[in-house]
């Protein structure tokens, strides 16, 4: 299938196929991944297991990663989507997930971490802040790689 899409849509497309539970809290620039997953789940689109993804929209990034952790504890294949400050708020739960050897996937649209103003510039300080959590990190250099590595991560 040939289709023009951006990295968010590519990652969402591949991750939806392999996900049973998606815990979301939309945050720019990763919002399109969560919004597409929400749309597809609401329309009953099936994953590779023949089921629509169960989507849980939470009140914060902490809630999203905690819901993902809970889904992983039940044996579900779970994912979440985030960026920048949202990812850093997930760090305490990331330690628990990695320490329990749970195979969750967090898709990150990396951007600059701002202290005093909003920024949408790309950089990896948000991801680098999570290196010590025990999570493995895969980074794409193109839209095609975003889709491929999304599938590989699952």
Segment roles from a protein language model:
Residues 1-129, 134, 151:
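Thiamine diphosphate
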Residues 137-154:
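Structural signature of the thiamine diphosphate
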